[in-house]
Amino acid sequence: MSGKGTSSRAYDMIMKLLLVGDSGVGKSCLLLRFVEDKFNPSFITTIGIDFKIRTIESKGKRIKLQVWDTAGQERFRTITTAYYRGAMGIVLIYDVTDSRSFENVENWFQTVTQHANEDAQIFLVGNKCDDEVNRQVSKEQGQELAAKLNVPFLEASAKSNENVDSIFYELASIIQEKHVEENIGGVGGASGAGGIDVSQNNSGAKNNCC
């Protein structure tokens, strides 16, 4: 998978993605690892909402991923739900070392389905899978919940960089396939929720990840 060194080329599509889940599950860490290939062990609470950009290649297309990192605290819930509109993909994250964050997944799923576009693709992620000593949620439990919710699932680790790229590449691929089905002309002309056909060069995208 290559998303490096070609930022001067035009991109074919923009995808707005949203990271949601309880506070402390590692949303910001996953995003930092994906975009900048860095890991910050310090817990820094997201205030409201933030976003980062990375451009990847998927199915022969240049996809500009605009990834929004939302606050997990209840007091920011009203603010962040406004950003669900237009999101083409939602990454719903829990912490495998925190059973409560896993128990809250279905509440988050309900919030997503209530506020996001009907065709938004949800992707379930169990973060911090490197910490087997403190694991409280098994991989099988995650798989069972994903099957119940009918969504794709991966365990990942921002710390060890396990499956971090895979989350976003797989989600982008699923969204592309949806748009191919909806737009016979291909994803380059997609104008649905968050999809933008552009002709100008994109020099600001961050591609410096492994």
Curated annotation (Swiss-Prot):
- Family matches, as SMART domains: ARF, RAB, RAN, RAS, RHO
Q: What is its main location?
A: membrane
Q: Which UniProt keywords apply?
A: Cell membrane, Cytoplasmic vesicle, Exocytosis, GTP-binding, Lipoprotein, Membrane, Nucleotide-binding, Prenylation, Protein transport, Transport
- One Pfam family it belongs to: Ras
Query: Record's family?
Result: Belongs to the small GTPase superfamily. Rab family.
NCBIfam families in UniProt: small_GTP (TIGR00231)
Protein name, per record: Ras-related protein SEC4
Organism classification: Eukaryota, Fungi, Dikarya, Ascomycota, Saccharomycotina
